[in-house]
UniProtKB/Swiss-Prot annotation:
Propeptide feature: residues: 21-41
Name by which UniProt lists this protein: Delta-actitoxin-Avd2b 4
Keywords of this entry: Disulfide bond, Ion channel impairing toxin, Nematocyst, Neurotoxin, Secreted, Signal, Toxin, Voltage-gated sodium channel impairing toxin
Intrachain disulfide bonds: 46-61, 47-55, 49-66
Function: Voltage-gated sodium channel (Nav) inhibitor. 1 uM completely inhibits insect voltage-gated sodium channel inactivation (DmNav1 from D.melanogaster).
Keyword Nucleotidyltransferase assigned: no
Native organism: Anemonia viridis (Snakelocks anemone)
Alphabetized SUPFAM superfamilies for the sequence: Neurotoxin III (ATX III)
Domain of life of the native organism: Eukaryota
GO cellular component: extracellular region; nematocyst
Family recorded in the similarity comment: Belongs to the sea anemone short toxin (type III) family.
Locations listed in the record: Secreted; Nematocyst
MF-aspect GO terms: sodium channel inhibitor activity; toxin activity
Length: 71
């Protein structure tokens, strides 16, 4: 029973991190979309640098979420 509870809690924590990462990256993209910025496609494939450069799926690391210069 404890193993199932532990797995459930770990999955919940993982989903929370994934959703927080999505929310962090969406705001600049919507702002750029409203301003007609054509770099929207580039900014969809990025991650914040507080992940210490451990970006997934070949994403680029940006210090300010998706809006800063690439690191």
């Amino acid at each position: 029973m404890m193993n199932r509870l532990l797995v459930f809690l770990m999955l919940g924590a993982f989903m929370l991190v994934v959703s927080a990462n999505d929310a962090y990256g969406d705001e600049p993209a919507f702002k750029d979309l409203n301003q007609g910025d054509e770099s929207l496609g580039k900014r969809k494939s990025c991650c914040p640098c507080w992940l210490r450069g451990n970006c997934f799926w070949g994403q680029n690391c940006y210090p300010e979420g998706c809006s800063g210069p690439k690191v």
